[in-house]
Curated annotation (Swiss-Prot):
Coiled-coil blocks: 755-793
The protein's name in its UniProt record: ETO1-like protein 1
One Gene Ontology biological process: negative regulation of ethylene-activated signaling pathway
CDD domains attached to this UniProt entry: BTB_POZ_ETO1-like (cd18190)
Highest taxon above the source species: Eukaryota
Protein species of origin: Arabidopsis thaliana
Residue ranges of TPR repeats: 381-414, 441-477, 511-544, 637-670, 711-744, 807-840, 842-873
Lineage: Eukaryota, Viridiplantae, Streptophyta, Embryophyta, Tracheophyta
Keyword Repeat among record annotations: yes
Gene: EOL1
Signal peptide: none
Tissue expression remark: Predominantly expressed in flowers.
Alphabetically ordered keywords of this record: Coiled coil, Ethylene signaling pathway, Repeat, TPR repeat, Ubl conjugation pathway
Domain notes: The BTB/POZ-like domain may mediate the interaction with some component of ubiquitin ligase complexes.
Quaternary structure and interacting proteins, as annotated: Interacts with the C-terminal domain of ACS4, ACS5 and ACS9.
Length: 888
């Protein structure tokens, strides 16, 4: 997917000024005369930057404070409120872009659910979130480990059975002489019943049969006008005697349920409710029964139908009948089907619907319900802000303004972006600028998104100043880099444009930034580089569409491919070896993508692709590649290796080891031994396991493999030897790895030099790595450990420029400031990074600094926020306990 919320300004036909065919109709890298004559004009309009997105997320000014509040409330609130607090925590992490953390919060909401409705909503939501992970469940089953997490629940078992009617109906007393039996006449048919049994069904029947009415003395009562069939009346009679419904058809149950409601027969209604719920066998059946359940106020049936709808997301939300039911229900009907979980329900539905189509009437309906069922300010903020984003997309500007205004007035300052954007659309550019200026001046410290948004309402140097400030405060924002790159390209400074976009691509592989760089390379006639970027983008997202979704990425890839030199299989392997050795991960991805289009050994290539994607911090794409490797494995023993990696990467280490052993049992192979060694080294706390790991890696090296993988095995073997203090053996491994151009072995060899007390040699070794590696932020960080403080500070400043998401440099600089008794400056240094990265170690260190200066309140806040990130971190728990004991 490109962007979730594309901008209106990008919806013009950008391809009117760009004909991809004309750009690519070239001979030997030269534009045709017609294309070249219009190139400057084309290129200026060709590369367009979409306006900054307004995200439909909860984005509090101080997420640390909010996480701390949630953590504190979780410690003190009643059990039934915990799920909704975890849902709020989920929304905070979603706004921060923390996928793993938000999913964990959703898991906690499900685990802490105290009602069946919460269990159904959160369980179904998790099932939706984990789409595509069914293979993991299957693999666990093959290892004898079963998961029953998200199977449909037996809804009826969570509802207490109705055991008796009112005392008046159950205890029948009368001084009047009446017969023991009564006959109900329906048309020409007569159904004989026991008067006492029928009377016990409800108070109305008791009054009818034993009350002070003339009819009460009758032995025969005509029920023909009560819209009940004789068959249904027989079911009522039988139930009055035996108390259960046996072998009753669905249609008859529906009729009996209506009858039970009419005559207030609670036990009978409950029995019908349960029986009907048990008969739901499909989506069609659930759709058919839901209207009836809501009309007749049947909670078990309604909840069971709802479970089917949620369990089948997202497909069920493409059914207009399902959507119609879920959006037209009134408050009472929502209570019938969702109990006390309506806000959770519509949070789930609106989020899934926004992923399908954020502009749809369905999304609007769900968001309006979300707002209706918000019970506090936080929930209202989320609902109104989302509603404002959706209204803005639909160009319903007045309604969008009302929603954003409400969210803003409730304290959601981020909603000011929506108000400013609306002001700009209506021609009030200065007002929009002043709105953001007011926000910036009222907040300390301001956040990056504030300057990014304000930049949209000014030009020239002012705009660039705001964008520089935005990057300084939040280097993860992509818009400033893209704008600066395109601006420099428009000034014919291609080198500066590439340097700018490479800044962010060095640490964040964002599709929109790859697209911009692709366009820059096209503008420079560098088709090989352009091809590399489009292939990398298609690796991340196979269905990626460029130019605001107007052109399929595959189409552009095909067009560019016609104008680069074709590589043979041997050429591809040489290119892969070269780029892998130079730690050029994006280049390696491109080569593998090209190789996969041939009939090469796809399993091996998809596996290599997954390794690269993990290095590039793209875990979801990496897992997709690993599953493709499994599907394309050429043998059972190869497939078992990929299954082992799938299990290991999803936290199932023992099962991963089991798969590796199964693979070795079929055939000894490099990858099976490597997997077994890797998993054992990473998971075992037993020091004696090192000898086993060494043996496994030695076995791996005896098996056939290519130099890329052998280099990795030698590098890993060297690491084990270092841990065992066998430095000579470790050095041999690293040197042998370098001989096959495993460039990262420089880092291991540097460690050996350092442990031999040769710090200068360690520094030089890391310098060699820096010179060779294209992605070298980690190398600068490691080199900083082998030099004096001033050089270390210089290296770590370089790390922050190359990859501002690496937290060690901030911690180091803060520690240096703390040593110099510059406590406030130290805390400010940590706060710089915490503003855009929810990191446990940063929060931990800042909490310790706050404790050191006696600021218990701030220390406790940071402890609680850190425990929201990792609830089981032992050192954090100890610090929290210590700080908590000092709280007044």
């Amino acid at each position: 997917m490109r962007t979730f919320y594309p901008s209106d300004s990008c919806k013009e036909s950008q391809l009117d000024s760009l004909n991809p065919q004309s750009w690519l109709q070239v001979e030997r890298g030269k534009l045709s005369s017609s294309a070249s004559s219009s190139a400057p004009l084309c290129r200026e309009s060709f590369i367009k930057v979409p306006e900054p997105q307004i995200l439909p997320h909860y984005k509090p000014l101080d997420y640390v404070e909010v996480l701390a509040q949630i953590h504190e409330e979780l410690d003190t609130c009643p059990l039934q409120e915990r799920s909704i607090l975890y849902l709020l925590q989920y929304q905070v992490f979603r706004g921060l872009g923390e996928t793993k953390l938000r999913r964990r919060s959703l898991q906690s909401a499900w685990q802490e659910a105290t009602t069946v409705h919460e269990k159904v909503v959160f369980g179904s939501w998790l099932r939706y979130e984990k789409q595509g992970e069914e293979v993991i469940t299957d693999l666990l089953s093959s290892c004898g480990k079963y998961s029953e997490e998200f199977v449909p629940l037996d809804i009826a078992s969570y509802f207490p059975a109705t055991t008796a009617s009112s005392p008046e109906a159950a205890s029948v007393k009368t001084n009047r002489s009446v017969s023991k039996n009564v006959v109900f006449k329906i048309g020409e048919e007569k159904i004989a019943c026991q008067r006492r049994k029928i009377a016990s069904l409800s108070a109305p029947f008791h009054a009818m049969l034993y009350g002070n009415f003339t009819e009460s003395l009758l032995d025969e009562i005509d029920m023909s006008e009560n819209h009940v069939s004789s068959s249904a009346m027989r079911v009522v009679r039988d139930f009055s005697v035996v108390g259960v419904l046996i072998g009753v058809s669905k249609n008859l149950l529906l009729e009996v349920l209506v009858f039970a409601n009419k005559f207030c027969c609670e036990r009978l209604k409950d029995a019908c409710d349960r029986e009907l719920a048990s008969l739901i066998s499909s989506m069609e059946c659930a759709i058919e029964l839901m209207d009836f359940a809501l009309e007749e106020n049947s909670p078990i049936l309604a909840s069971s139908c709802l479970q089917v709808f949620l369990y089948e997301m997202p497909d069920s939300l493409n059914d207009e009948r399902v959507v119609e039911v879920l959006t037209r229900v009134n408050r009472s009907q929502v209570s019938t089907m969702a109990g006390k979980a309506p806000f959770s329900l519509y949070s789930c539905l609106s989020e899934v619907s926004m992923c399908i189509d954020p502009r749809s009437d369905r999304t609007l309906g769900f968001l309006e319900k979300l707002v209706d069922f918000a019970e506090n300010d936080r929930q209202q903020v989320l609902g109104f802000h989302r509603l404002g984003c959706m209204r803005l997309l639909r160009k319903e500007y007045r309604e969008a303004e009302e929603a954003f205004e409400t969210a803003f007035n409730l304290g959601h300052v981020y909603s000011a972006t929506g108000l400013a954007r609306l002001g700009y659309i209506q021609g009030h550019r200065l007002w929009a600028y002043e709105k953001l200026s007011s926000v910036i001046s009222s907040v300390s410290p301001p956040l990056g998104w504030m300057y990014q948004e304000r930049s949209f309402y000014c030009e020239g140097d002012k705009k660039l100043e705001d964008l520089e400030k935005a990057t300084e405060l939040d280097p993860t924002l992509t818009y400033p880099y893209m704008y600066r790159a395109v601006t420099r390209m428009s000034k014919q400074n291609a080198k500066a444009a590439l340097e700018e976009i490479n800044r962010i691509l060095g640490f964040k592989l964002a599709l929109e930034c790859l697209e911009i760089r692709f366009c820059l390379y096209l503008g420079m006639d560098d088709y090989e580089a352009a091809l590399r970027d489009i292939q990398a983008a298609l690796t991340l997202c196979p269905d990626y569409r460029m130019f605001d979704g107007k052109v399929a990425g595959r189409q552009l890839q095909t067009l560019v491919y016609e104008h680069v030199e074709n590589w043979t299989t041997a050429d591809c392997w040489m290119q892969l070896y070269e780029k892998w050795s130079n730690v050029d991960d994006i280049g390696s991805l491109s080569v593998i993508y090209q190789m996969l289009e041939s009939d090469a050994c796809k399993g091996v290539l998809y596996f290599r692709q997954s390794l690269l994607l993990l290095r590039l911090n793209c875990p979801e794409a990496a897992m997709r590649s690993l599953q493709l490797a499994r599907e394309h494995a050429s043998s059972d023993h190869e497939r078992l290796v990929y299954e082992g990696w799938i299990l290991y990467d999803t936290g199932h280490c023992e099962e991963g080891l089991q798969k590796a052993k199964e693979s070795i049992g079929i055939k000894r192979s490099f990858e099976a031994y490597f997997l077994q060694a890797y998993a054992l080294a990473e998971s075992s706390l037993d020091p004696s396991s090192s000898s086993t790991v060494v043996s496994l890696l030695e076995d791996a090296l005896k098996c056939p493999s290519d130099r890329l993988r052998k280099g990795q095995a030698l590098n890993n073997l060297g690491s084990v030897y270092v841990d065992c203090e066998k430095l000579d053996l470790a050095a041999d491994c690293y040197i042998n790895a370098l001989k096959v151009r495993h460039t990262r072995a420089h880092q291991g060899l540097a460690r050996v030099h350092f442990l031999r007390n040769d710090k200068a040699a360690a520094y030089e070794e890391m310098t060699r790595l820096i010179e060779k590696a294209q992605n070298n932020a980690s190398a600068y960080e490691k080199r900083s450990e082998y030099c004096d403080r001033e050089l270390a500070k210089s290296d770590l400043e370089m790390v922050t420029r190359l990859d501002p998401l690496r937290v060690y440099p901030y911690r180091y600089r803060a520690a240096v400031l703390m040593d110099s008794r510059k406590e406030r400056e130290a805390i400010t240094e940590l706060s710089r990074a915490i503003a855009f990265k929810a990191d446990l170690h940063l929060l931990h260190l800042r909490a310790a600094f706050h404790e050191h200066i006696g600021d218990v309140t701030s220390a406790l806040r940071d402890c609680r926020a850190a425990l929201s990130v990792d609830p089981n971190h032992q050192e954090m728990l100890e610090l929290h306990s210590r700080v908590n004991s000092h709280e007044p």
